[in-house]
């Protein structure tokens, strides 16, 4: 399994011979970075086998890229109902079963369309977008994750407790700003929490960095 960070909170996942882009092209929403032009150009010239989109916020979603992908009929697009071209159904991609789950954005009192995804292949991968960690507390109806791809809230305070309880061997933390431009103190909060409460292997990839996890 190969995971490449391509966006603020998104990755290109290569699993069982399939390339799946998950929230993988985004715009800048300060202090969170945009997809670098070189990475975007590469993705446009070699389109993935499927797109998974969690929600419509610009730090997770780029309408022009999705439209281009659909026009080239490159593959299925899963996402919430308020994003054009998407469907909300589970599907099978090669050896991978993809579950599309209705979920709730962190801290959003007002309704917001949001999906999370569980991918079951040779490894089980959870990609949660900006879903609240509380949604997964004491859940027994979903397959145990091998790898979780999650935003910073899952490594701070009670979010880390829930993350550890789910039993993943590896956690890839996304949606962090540059350490030099962190007005909310997220890096410090993550560092303190993880130091005080050791858990699964934690990866915090830089933009464009690739993580190889043996299958």
Give the role of each language-model region.
Residues 84-96, 110-111, 162-215:
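Binuclear metal-ion centers of metallo-dependent hydrolases, dominated by the metallo-beta-lactamase
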Residues 1-21, 26-29, 35-37, 181, ...:
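Zn-dependent metallo-beta-lactamase
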Residues 16-52, 64-68, 132-143:
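Pre-active-site segment of Zn-dependent metallo-hydrolases
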